[in-house]
Amino acid sequence: MKYGISTLSIIPVRQLPSDTAEMTTQLLFGEHFKILEVRKKWSKVLISHDDYKGWVCNKQITIIDEEEYQKLEKETATISTDILDIIGADINQPIVMGSILPSYKSDHALINNKMYKFTGNSTQGFSQKKKLIENALIYLNAPYLWGGRSPFGIDCSGFTQLIYRLQGVKLPRDAYQQSEIGNTLSFIEE
């Protein structure tokens, strides 16, 4: 089994192995995954945090070993909380709100023994309930993008998944999956 991680700001994940195929979700910086199948230009991946499958262009994959993958599986994720932050190893690059900072220590993330200096705000674990609303309002007027997961283009279930991620809660990717978890509340007296 091969493993990978996103070291780019945003990577499109497609339904089929083609540049013109539907984008079903996006990988944000620091999100890791299993590589299920490798073809000439594309790899089929299983995203760790939500078990979502799709195709990613091979040029956009950073390979990690199983030991690093297992370490990432066990650690409590540190998450960037600003609309746009800067992270850099050799060069600085923007990362969006909700990106993961693997093996985060004080001001840097670590991927494949390479340090990525981080300048911005982050959170780890559960946040106060009022932060949920504050974070949600940041996405006000964000454009709709099918499969999107950033303030620059987002869909309904991507929005819900990211807002709760910032609260330390893992949710599945699609709305139908999200509706199947949690507790049903009755708002009408019976």
Which residues are covered by each model-predicted region?
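Short, flexible active-site loops
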Residues: 139-149, 178
